[in-house]
Amino acid sequence: IKELVQKALDGGAAPDDILDHGLMKGMGVVGKRFGDGDMFIPEVMLSARTMHAALELLRPILEGQKKKLQMKGKIVLGTVAGDIHDIGKSLVEMMFVAGGFEVIDLGINVAPQAFVEAVNKHEPDVVGMSALLTSTMPAMAETIEAIDNAGLRKDFRLKIIVGGAPITADYAEQIGADLYGENAIEAVEVVKKALAK
């Protein structure tokens, strides 16, 4: 992809046009095909990695032209305490980056207090939590409680989204999450809609 992006730049294409009319449109097609069941997680991950590689080339050019990438929002992301699974969270991270978000990845096995500290430090629009094991689901509730106890949602600006194999929309509501993403593509769309309100 870097060669194709460089070829487009050398041919006179504007970096923001490459991003908006090429890369973002392509990721939109990926999202639709995944949602329709015509594309599967390995292809989505490959597409997201490709987008990420293209952004690595375009970002310094855009910033050099004082056209800083217009981010759609900032998200702090992590797998909750006790859970060491990375693939789902990594896919979600790549899809958010591809969707135009700044992502602060806290990694795996993230304690509730680490989420609180990251929210204080980075002032994100959204906190995203992932869990793959049913045994770590309570850690989501504990993390949301810690964020609320720290007063970080009192102005209703900060949104919390949860997801992962054992998580359901009902569970998300039960533990006080604002949003639920059934998969990586849906998570990005749900967050975009929530932030547009």
Model-derived features: positions:
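Cofactor-cradling patches in redox/metallo enzymes
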Residues: 92-99, 104-177, 190-192
